[in-house]
Amino acid sequence: MPKQKTNRAAAKRFKVTAKGKIKSANAFTSHRFHGKTKKQRRQLRGTAIIEKPMVKTYHKLLQK
């Protein structure tokens, strides 16, 4: 039986931490910053941890 392939689109967008959590960039960060407060812009700079219900799905895509 052949090996399962990693979904390349998901591999470019998500990273798995050492403990198995999945990190991704925040949404709403490409443009239109004039409508956001300074606090919103600052908080969007970091990375986000994917919520628990979606983790299993992303692990299947990433084959980890």
UniProtKB/Swiss-Prot annotation:
Sections of the chain in a coiled coil: none
Xref: Pfam families: Ribosomal_L35p
Keyword Ribonucleoprotein: yes
GO BP term, pick one: translation
Taxonomy, superkingdom: Bacteria
GO molecular function, one term: structural constituent of ribosome
UniProt keyword terms in alphabetical order: Ribonucleoprotein, Ribosomal protein
PROSITE patterns for the chain: RIBOSOMAL_L35 (PS00936)
A single cellular component GO annotation: cytosolic large ribosomal subunit
Keyword Ribosomal protein: yes
InterPro entries associated with the record: Ribosomal_bL35 (IPR001706), Ribosomal_bL35-like (IPR021137), Ribosomal_bL35_CS (IPR018265), Ribosomal_bL35_sf (IPR037229)
Annotated SUPFAM superfamilies: L35p-like (SSF143034)
Record HAMAP family: Ribosomal_bL35 (MF_00514)
Family indicated by similarity: Belongs to the bacterial ribosomal protein bL35 family.
Name this protein carries in UniProt: Large ribosomal subunit protein bL35
Protein source organism: Lactiplantibacillus plantarum (strain ATCC BAA-793 / NCIMB 8826 / WCFS1) (Lactobacillus plantarum)
Gene: rpmI
